[in-house]
Each structure stands twice: as structure tokens, then as C-alpha cells.
């Protein structure tokens, strides 16, 4: 599977840390030419240096279509085109529904949902020229499948991403571009670690595999969607959650 990614041009938005960094690492190790994008160019460059394998960092803002158009051109110019977009950029600041402000709602929607639209729209002209155009969206089990208190805005954007994906895959099929999504459960990232050790233990205990996922787990799922082995797969999702959404797991979590 990894052989089909060798030499392919890949852009990972939100790739300087967390899940995005894991995705970038997996693709780079598979021989792809990886561009890591972050709102902070220095962080993207630092992540690229750490990952190696010819990866490079670039600054960009998914909340701006003009910024994403500039990023796509820069990546295509440097890598000789664009084959894979991993639309991963996202934020998840907690806010309870009754206390949430309109500004808090808009910030998450602008980054997670509108940012996905901007990224995909800007990538289309370049993906159309690829013989293996791929779009892989990082969604979540929160929103599309289950809910999580304190993240109403986040869940809404993640459900929205799947609605976007299921229509975009139909519109872009005529160009041979596939559009799929990976739905992570609880993955060990800087954000999860910041919630405290007890939170991590509670989440791990609620998962049938009795452990949390690592960022590379999401990277391997994204790698499959981007590979030639997934040529006939579009409009689909892969849930990477260790079995967390199984009924027994949700019951255990509710009782925790």
C-alpha cells in the first residue's frame, strides 16, 4: 500500500501537532512529498524538520480562502502538483451550550467546517490534474455518531463535515477524485493530555481495547484512503476508536 504513495504530493492542514503531525509522519515514511501547514509557519517548519523525509512546512489559514489558494499554489509549485489533501485542521475549545457565546460558536465553525470547504475548494484545480486525486477529511466520532457534553459546537462541525463529504464525493467523482473521512475516537494528543491524567484513564477504561489510540493510528487510516488500493472507495468513513462507540462502551462511559 505504501508503494503507491511514493513520490506523491501531499498537503496536511493542521499538521504541526497532534493528529495532523501523525498523519504527516505516516505519509512521509511512505515516501510521499509532504507539506505540513499550520497557522504558525515556524511550528510547521519545526514539525517538518522533526519528521524529515523531505517534508516541509508552510504557513496558512484555513479560515481564509485566499490563504488556502496561496498555499495550494505554493505546494503544487514546489512538489510538481498536488495528489492528496488531508483536511485535518480543527479546534475543539470546550464550551457548555448554555454558556456558549456566538463568537465561540463561530470560531469553531469557521475553522472546522468552513475551513474544510476552503481547503477542498482551493485544492480542486490541482487534484483534477492528478491521476490519483484524494481528499481525506479528519472528522470525529463526536457529532456524526455520538455526543460529548461541552462540545456542542465541535460535534456540529464534525457532523457537518460528513454531510459535506457525502455530497462533494459525488460532485468530484467525474474528475476521478475520491473524498473520504476518518473518524477518530480518543487519541493521545496535546489536547487530550491537557485534560489531565484521570480523564485519560477514564477514557481508556471505556474502550474495549482498554487503551487510547495514537496519532499514527489515524495516519494509517488516511494512508489507506489515499492509496491506489482505495481507488474504488469514495464517500466512506473509517472509525478509529478502539471500539469506543459500541453500546457496551458508551454505557460504561456514562457510568464513569
Segments from the language model and where they lie:
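Short C-terminal tail/terminal secondary-structure segment
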Residues: 234-256
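Short, small/polar-rich loop/turn modules that mediate ligand/substrate recognition or access, typified
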Residues: 86, 173, 178, 233-235
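Substrate-binding pocket helix/loop in short-chain dehydrogenase/reductase
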Residues: 96-97, 104-109, 192, 203
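The beta1-alpha1 cofactor-binding region of Rossmann-like NAD(H)/NADP(H)-dependent oxidoreductases
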Residues: 41, 60-71, 102, 216-217
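Active-site helix of classical SDR
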Residues: 120, 157, 165
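Alpha-helical segment proximal to the catalytic Tyr-Lys
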Residues: 125, 170-171, 231
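Conserved glycine-rich cofactor-binding loop
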Residues: 9, 16-18
Amino acid at each position: 500500500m505504501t508503494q503507491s504513495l511514493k513520490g506523491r504530493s501531499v498537503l496536511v492542514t493542521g499538521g504541526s501537532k497532534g493528529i495532523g503531525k501523525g498523519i504527516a509522519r505516516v505519509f512521509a515514511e511512505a515516501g510521499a512529498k509532504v507539506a505540513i501547514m499550520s497557522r504558525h509557519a515556524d511550528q510547521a517548519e519545526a514539525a517538518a524538520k522533526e519528521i524529515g523525509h523531505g517534508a516541509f512546512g508552510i504557513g496558512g489559514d484555513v479560515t481564509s480562502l485566499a490563504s488556502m489558494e496561496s498555499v495550494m499554489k505554493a505546494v503544487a509549485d514546489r512538489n510538481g502538483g498536488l495528489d492528496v489533501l488531508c483536511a485535518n485542521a480543527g479546534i475543539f475549545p470546550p464550551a457548555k451550550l448554555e454558556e456558549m457565546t456566538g463568537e465561540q460558536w463561530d470560531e469553531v465553525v469557521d475553522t472546522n467546517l468552513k475551513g474544510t470547504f476552503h481547503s477542498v475548494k482551493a485544492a480542486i484545480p490541482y487534484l483534477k490534474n492528478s491521476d490519483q486525486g484524494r481528499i481525506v477529511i479528519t472528522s470525529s466520532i463526536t457529532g456524526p455518531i455520538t455526543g460529548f457534553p461541552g462540545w456542542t459546537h465541535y460535534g456540529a462541525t464534525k457532523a457537518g463535515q460528513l454531510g459535506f463529504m457525502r455530497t462533494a464525493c459525488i460532485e468530484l467523482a467525474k474528475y476521478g477524485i475520491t473524498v473520504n473521512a476518518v473518524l477518530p475516537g480518543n487519541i493521545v494528543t496535546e489536547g487530550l493530555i491537557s485534560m489531565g491524567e484521570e480523564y485519560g484513564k477514564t477514557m481508556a477504561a471505556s474502550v474495549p481495547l482498554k487503551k487510547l489510540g495514537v496519532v499514527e493510528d489515524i495516519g494509517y487510516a488516511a494512508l489507506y484512503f489515499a492509496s491506489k488500493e482505495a481507488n474504488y472507495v469514495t464517500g466512506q468513513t473509517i472509525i478509529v476508536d478502539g471500539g469506543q462507540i459500541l453500546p457496551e462502551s458508551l454505557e460504561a462511559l456514562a457510568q464513569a
